[in-house]
């Protein structure tokens, strides 16, 4: 009698807008112990790199890569895998806000590139913050388009600050003037998804 076994390698990747990593450290650690992700991408860490609480994550086996700033924004990627490469910020885009980190992980599946984003909110719209949001999205789209040419495992995740469709909110009418819901935001978001 023959038995055929298939071994399926699964990589568990999660994303979480923590709204201050230092305020939520115990919640994050509890969740990690429960869910055991291979990679956890955090947004809105709200801490400069030198003050990021590395030790609690390193003590449970995570490699930590951060791109932070004081009191606002910030992204971090925690990985059980060796992180071979880290890119802070979208290339060729002069941006002083810490909203993008890209990491390459040496996993059981081979190399995995992960783009962890915290897309700008953009309110009030119209205005400079909305213009910044749209420009950021277009720069992101261009970078992702170029990176996809590498034909490697590439995962894009994070907090997109977009309401893609009417069904994604209880009351679309309440959101009609919000940057997250404006047609131009949704259009560029769909362009990113269609890459």
Language-model regions, residue ranges each:
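Active-site-proximal beta-strand elements of phosphoester/diester hydrolases
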Residues: 10-20, 111-123, 157
